[in-house]
Amino acid sequence: MAIERYFIREAVKEMLIDEFLEKELRRAGYGGLDIKKTPLGTKVIIFAANPGYVIGRGGRRIRELTRILERQFGLENPQIDVQEIKNPYLNAKVQAVRIAQALERGIHFRRAAYSAMRAIMNNGARGVEIRLSGKLTGERAKSVRFYQGYLAKVGNPAETLVSKGYAQALLKLGVIGVKVAIMPPDARLPDEIEIVEKPAEEEVSTNEAE
């Protein structure tokens, strides 16, 4: 039980760090992180489309992030390694954040979703799925799913081959959840796939969206 509590605590901590970095590094094209324990402390790999923004002038921002990770989140001797995302259009986290930013700028949710989906597919993705959940058009909350191409949906392939990302858009009507899943060009297609040759859209129930 103690081991289970430890892993739960570490998972929650990583989630909180991810949320913090998403807010702090939106302009950097933040694409997620990986935390690894080492004999010397904690290695934190930050993936970003613009590593220079994460590092900051003279390394100022990365030093500040290091202090926050140590003092606020309790990481032992954190060592930050910033890795560049070669193609942000194939990183689901980056795309989820960009869609959220578009919604916050007042762009209609369908336009934001289809624009992102088109750009993702044009960059070679085998498939993409975008889910927007919340008060999209009025007082009633709903979830709309946009999808195209080939996407592993279940089992190990869905966990290992598909890039997944989540972000939130803060609007006057409330919070809009943005989920993005992308199957990259080099993914080997499993048996369990969904094939949609043309862009499609459907409204799904709130329960299903969860």
From Swiss-Prot:
SUPFAM superfamilies referenced in this protein's UniProt entry, alphabetically: Prokaryotic type KH domain (KH-domain type II), Ribosomal protein S3 C-terminal domain
Start and end residues of each KH type-2 domain: 17-86
Family: Belongs to the universal ribosomal protein uS3 family.
Membrane-crossing residue ranges in chain numbering: none
GO cellular component term, pick one: cytosolic small ribosomal subunit
NCBIfam families (UniProt xref): PRK04191.1, uS3_euk_arch
Keyword Cell membrane: no
Superkingdom to which the source organism belongs: Archaea
UniProt xrefs under PROSITE patterns: KH_TYPE_2 (PS50823)
Oligomer status and interactors: Part of the 30S ribosomal subunit.
Keyword set, alphabetical order: Ribonucleoprotein, Ribosomal protein, RNA-binding, rRNA-binding
Species: Pyrococcus horikoshii (strain ATCC 700860 / DSM 12428 / JCM 9974 / NBRC 100139 / OT-3)
HAMAP family associated with the record: Ribosomal_uS3_A (MF_01309_A)
A GO term, aspect molecular function: structural constituent of ribosome
Name of the protein described by the UniProt record: Small ribosomal subunit protein uS3
Protein function: Binds the lower part of the 30S subunit head.
UniProt keyword rRNA-binding present: yes
InterPro entries for this protein: KH_dom, KH_dom-like_a/b, KH_dom_type_2, KH_sf_prok-type, Ribosomal_S3_C_sf, Ribosomal_uS3_arc, Ribosomal_uS3_C, Ribosomal_uS3_euk/arc
